[in-house]
Amino acid sequence: VRFYLLHSLSHLLITSISLHCGYPSASIHERLYCAPHDGEPAMAAILLATGSAGAEGTLGGLVEEGRRIGRHLRRALEMGSLCANDPVCGGHTPEGDYAERFLEGAACHGCLFVAEPSCERFNRFLDRALVVPTLGQDPRLAFFDAP
C-alpha cells in the first residue's frame, strides 16, 4: 500500500509541478524509494528530476520548485480528488472486473497516468483513492483528507 500511495502522489506532483514551472510532464522523471519496516527504518521518498537536455539552469529550475512544495502538494491533492472519468475511474478497484487493469485502482489517463518515460513502473501500481478521497471509494482509505 505504501508504494501505491507514493507512486500515485508522485504522479500527481509531476502534473502539478509541470503546470506551474513550464517543464512538460514528459521531461520530469520519478525515482521512488520505498521499503517496509523489516528491522530497519521504513523508507518512503520521492525524487523528481528533469531529464531534458538544454541550456544551463535546467536542473536549477526544478530545484527552485522545492521551495514551493507545499503549494504543489495542495494543488496535487486538489487535482487527485476528482477525475474527468469519475465515477468509473474512482470506483475501480484492483480486484475489479477489468482483468487488464489488475495492478491499478482509481487511475487512468484522465488523472494519474503520465508519459511512460517519466514513470519508472510504466503507469502500474497507481491508486489515487489511497492519496485523497475519491468518488466511489471509502474516504478512510485515503492518507490525506479532502482538500
Task: Please annotate each region the language model reported.
Residues 1-147:
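C-terminal accessory domains/tails appended to large, multi-domain proteins
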